[in-house]
Amino acid sequence: MKRVLRGALIPALVFLLWEAGSRADLLPMDTLSRPSDIAVALAGGFVDGSILLATWQTVQAALSGFAIAAAAGILVGAILGLSPPIERTVGPSIEALRPIPAVALTPLTLLLFGFGLRMEAGVVAFACVWPILLVTVAAVRGIEPRLLEVAQILRLGFAARLRKIILPAALGRIVVGLRVALSISLIVAVTVEILMNPRGLGYGMIIASQSLKPDLMYAQLLWLGFLGWGLNAALTRAFGSWHGAFGPGVRP
Amino acid sequence: MSVPPLLSLAGVSVSFGSPADGHEVLSEISFDVPDGEFLCIVGPSGCGKTTLVRLLAGLLAPSGGQILFQGRPLAGTSRDRAIVFQDYSKALLPWRTVAGNIALSLEACGIAEPERSERIGALLAKMRLEPAAARFPSQLSGGMQQRVQIARSLAQQPKLLLMDEPFGALDAITRQDLQDEIARLVAENRTTVVFITHDLEEAIYLGDRVIVLAAEPGRIAEMIEVGIPRPRDQLETREDRRFLEHRHRLFGLLQGH
């Protein structure tokens, strides 16, 4: 609790100075709204439900894209990590696709899916799949060969080997890729909304900005920051307890 | 009409690299292991001990010669042949408890509850691991971790137990404890063992028979019957006239040069 208070000290100070500065007419009101006005705008957005709806739309797109990327990235990554010949065949194509900026696919997904959830989730999935895929390949390759020999001696089939040896042994490192991908998912979802998809918090911010309501824009921006922090904390918590399965003091 | 040996090697060789300039690791290895024998193989480093145990496990195929297991050519791994590795910390699953690690073998053998739990309980008792059942390998001493690996190997009820320098990384006192323990377990279960070591005294102390390998390329230098009755004793056996004779005779062979 003491740590939380200590961490909140600087933001509280910034808001206080900001409020005081704008009340003393030291800050330009048309770009830097007052924190009190921002709080009112945020509360209003919650009361009329607009922020909640936009949040749901953004999070839904980010998480759908992330989930697709996680499933595809881990499965393909495990196969590539286990089979060097397949990796040598598929690897160059991956290296050719990977540098394409995900956001540049927005026009293509618009053609494919039209406006809405599917185009946004598609772009998010494309952006998120690479870190998960690459980390999974490296993690599976880095598995202690002794463990694979144990699996061989016990004659575990492919599915059992994947479930009982490979994934648990690699998961500690795969989680790193998942965390990177999760933060990317929110960034890309909001970017696609700001670019052209008329839904979610990104679109809400563009509209607020264009209709000269900086307080509402700031309200959504702050809320977005809080959302990203919450997502990351949830993931850390979920896998923090999983790390515990290794016993105290052991990190894979 | 004699009973065929459990394991039989005839002219087995292993080379790495191309046939022309390949490096020969094992050359013309031939020996039989009858059912129930405790065979120790001792040799200096670089004599292909580990390569030999990988051959017997089926993790490696020979370049020449033939290996028969139960009268049939040995091809690939089998749950009838268990292996205890020297590096116990790498061979155990760090995310599973002691009981969970033993369960892995039983899962692989398709043994379902409640029999699985019963057999885990029996093995924990046999290996004196009961107090550690719910702990993780990283929380155990080296000796305890090696006990877990031995328990996991016994769980698959192998016909042949392969041990690759299993006590090489342990301190002297723990090593003696585990030597007596494995001798007792093997006598109880009548398991056939091929035990690899670089410690001549350990080989004579544990084995019914000792094979000494020479290096470059790995080949059989000598084979002796130990002929000291069991149960053996860490003090008395090591002072036994026959023990000392074997030790004197084989010591020179391990000096290399």
Task: Annotate each predicted stretch with a short phrase.
Chain B
Residues 136-140, 144:
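Conserved ABC ATPase signature
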Residues 65-77:
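Conserved ABC transporter NBD signature motif
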Residues 107, 112-132, 184:
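Conserved ABC ATPase "signature" region
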Residues 42-44:
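The feature captures the beta-strand-to-loop junction immediately N-terminal to the Walker
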Residues 155-159:
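A short, proline-enriched helix->beta-strand linker immediately N-terminal to the Walker B motif
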